[in-house]
Curated annotation (Swiss-Prot):
PROSITE patterns: TIM_1, TIM_2. One of its GO terms (cellular component) is cytosol. This is Triosephosphate isomerase. Substrate binds at N9, W10, K11, G172, S212, G233, G234. It holds the Pfam family TIM. GO terms for molecular function: triose-phosphate isomerase activity. It comes from Clostridium kluyveri (strain ATCC 8527 / DSM 555 / NBRC 12016 / NCIMB 10680 / K1).
Length: 248
């Protein structure tokens, strides 16, 4: 039985004071959660948030990282830096990174491997555009993304990975894939993993849905057999809303 995981991606929101205020309000609201709870604040808030949630059931993730340990990469953060802050997770390959920063599947693969070297769990994102869905190539696009992202990993690494299916057309638009669309697409992703690393790995890997997730939609989504959680954007910035999603 796969344990659900709900992660909040704050994106480029919240200064340090606002971040700590949000966390303090959230902590008692999710104390009894049956799922894994992860917060992914901006880099500048990571250290303070890690310290604030110490001793609670909340884990902390970063929103991105570089695949090199150090060097002349102005503005970048290394996996070793994240590990020194006691970060447990890192989002890799978010659609906004692909769109605005031209991040490629091969780069994502390098980041995944480097995250594992530092015992950081990758939340690996994949998803299709509206045009790709309308053209009927969703499965082809996702298959390519997953095959390249998970290339040359060990089976035990794949079993630890969290995959987030985020239809690009549903991010920040208010549009949401139907529960059946989301479940069927995630089932396809699981099938790709099965062909690469075997049925056991595919059954163990946790796959989230991420696309305008709200308190009103989460319960039905979590009733789908292949959906193991959510990567939450805007709703994670509101403690009451995020808690309602966590406590679905």
């Amino acid at each position: 039985m796969r344990k659900a995981i709900i992660a909040g991606n704050w994106k480029m929101n919240k200064n340090l004071e606002d971040a700590l205020e949000l966390v303090e309000e959230l902590k008692p609201l999710v104390r009894g959660a049956k799922c894994d709870v992860v917060l992914c604040p901006p880099y500048v808030c990571l250290d303070a948030v890690v310290k604030s949630v110490g001793g609670t059931n909340i884990k902390v993730g970063a929103q991105n990282m570089h695949y090199e340990e150090s060097g002349a990469y102005t503005g970048e953060i290394s996996p070793g830096m994240l590990k020194s802050l006691k970060v447990d997770y890192v989002i890799i390959g978010h659609s906004e990174r692909r769109q605005y920063f031209n991040e490629k599947d091969e780069t994502i693969n390098k980041k995944i491997k480097k995250a594992f070297e530092h015992d950081i769990i990758p939340i690996v994102c994949c998803g299709e555009s509206l045009l790709e869905r309308e053209n009927g190539i969703t499965e082809e696009v996702l298959g390519r993304q997953i095959k390249l992202a998970l290339k040359d990993l060990r089976k035990e690494q794949v079993e630890k990975i969290v995959i987030a299916y985020e239809p690009i057309w549903a991010i920040g638009t208010g549009k949401t894939a139907t529960d059946k669309q989301a479940n069927d697409t995630i089932a396809h992703i699981r099938g790709v993993v099965s062909k690469m690393y075997g049925e056991n790995a595919a059954e163990v890997v946790r796959i989230q849905y991420g696309g305008s997730v709200k308190p009103a939609t989460i319960k039905a989504q979590m009733e789908q057999p292949h959906i193991d959680g959510a990567l939450v954007g805007g709703a994670s910035l509101k403690p009451q809303d995020f808690a309602a999603i966590v406590n679905y």
